[in-house]
Amino acid sequence: MIMPGMEYSTVSKIYGPLMIVQGVKGVAYGEVVEIETESGEKRKGQVLEAREDMAIVQVFEGTRDLDIKTTRVRFTGETLKVPVSMDMLGRIFNGIGKPIDGGPEIIPEDRRDVHGAPLNPVARAYPRDFIQTGISAIDGMNTLVRGQKLPIFSGSGLPHNMLAAQIARQAKVLGEEEQFAVVFAAMGITYEEANFFKKSFEETGAIERAVLFLNLADDPAIERIITPRMALTVAEYLAFDYDMQVLVILTDMTNYAEALREISAAREEVPGRRGYPGYMYTDLATIYERAGRVRGKKGSITQMPILTMPDDDITHPIPDLTGYITEGQIVLSRELHRKGIYPPIDVLPSLSRLMKDGIGKGRTREDHPQLSQQLYAAYAEGRSLRDLVAVVGEEALSETDRKYLKFADRFEREFVAQRYDEDRSIFETLDLGWELLAELPESELKRVRKEYILKYHPKYRKRGE
């Protein structure tokens, strides 16, 4: 319960999600504000800017129906905090942390600042160990590592929501002794999308190990600034207080950035690239950099932010700045989507910079690093030959070239493509990779050691059996 502090009735202006309060004293940046209307309705806000005798307040539930003359504003002297408890697992909340699943209010074990506790860089442990998503194009080619931040770059109309739900449902760490949880935060989604996520989690039982925060498209845009921070605060609590391995999925970060731009425009700030605020890089970093591991703690926070690239432009400020902060990207392809391939992950522009630290002997399998390199090289060769065929025709190709073409087609249809309910183990993924490489002459497998070929290639494996 917010304790009453200094109260004012000196609102001078309301515009967009913001209000200006005059004649204030001792107000601090980030301070929580309680706003009361003439009818007694209460809303929350936060100080966005504090000057000597004036404060700009962002109102989380929106400024609709607020009257300058009758609105009262109470400055609480506290920062914005979220109540946390293990009872949050299995629950669904709105964008500012209120239950929307018909269940009771959370009885908090603690209240944590939504901006998180400062973390000394020296205290960080290097991200290691494999997280299995059950999706071959990620596990085999762009492996997710505990403590990593690996975004998914999508486009409007591509099935990133299905992919997010599938990852949230299937993700696990190898080893039964590890406790795993998913914190899922959606920003600016439609009712249809919200129902899809609820249904996906509830019908599969994944809700039991998950916490959902859903900010809808018709909720005030200002709430989208708070939603990912609420989710990450809960994730930090589960990871560092209860030693859980937590996967945080944030979708759609483009909606978050649009809300940031809306607030910046309302404050009449000087715009940066394409109208986004000049501090967007720093703001995104305050979210993405909350992933990681801490020395002396068993838990970890792994992030998979999802963003839709406007006009499929990977140089747009949102994916561009995200790429600078994060450790790779998973890129969804419209061309693969048109072919009916799900998930339409294009492995060539995709990258996991920390993959090498989470795979190999003792983590996945000894042949994984070299196998993924060989698959990547063979698929790249097949893709380049497709362009050549469009010019000279398939008749001009050698027999080996035709095999590369066939490999590329099979790679997309059999390795990348899988059912929405298909959960492949890492060993199934690696064995499937070898099955596809059997399409090529053995002399072309130049990136894999001979000992691995003799051990895992289908020709020798079947002979050994």
From Swiss-Prot:
SUPFAM superfamilies: C-terminal domain of alpha and beta subunits of F1 ATP synthase, N-terminal domain of alpha and beta subunits of F1 ATP synthase, P-loop containing nucleoside triphosphate hydrolases. InterPro entries: ATP-synt_VA_C, ATPase_a/bsu_AS, ATPase_A1-cplx_bsu, ATPase_F1/V1/A1_a/bsu_N, ATPase_F1/V1/A1_a/bsu_N_sf, ATPase_F1/V1/A1_a/bsu_nucl-bd, P-loop_NTPase, V-ATPase_su_B/beta. Its main location: membrane. Belongs to the ATPase alpha/beta chains family. GO terms for biological process: proton motive force-driven plasma membrane ATP synthesis. It holds the Pfam family ATP-synt_ab_N. Has multiple subunits with at least A(3), B(3), C, D, E, F, H, I and proteolipid K(x). GO terms for molecular function: ATP binding; proton-transporting ATP synthase activity, rotational mechanism. It is a peripheral membrane protein. One of its GO terms (cellular component) is proton-transporting two-sector ATPase complex, catalytic domain. The keyword Membrane applies. Gene3D superfamilies: 3.40.50.12240. The keyword Transport applies. Component of the A-type ATP synthase that produces ATP from ADP in the presence of a proton gradient across the membrane. The B chain is a regulatory subunit. It is found in: Cell membrane. Keywords: ATP synthesis, Cell membrane, Hydrogen ion transport, Ion transport, Membrane, Transport. This is A-type ATP synthase subunit B.
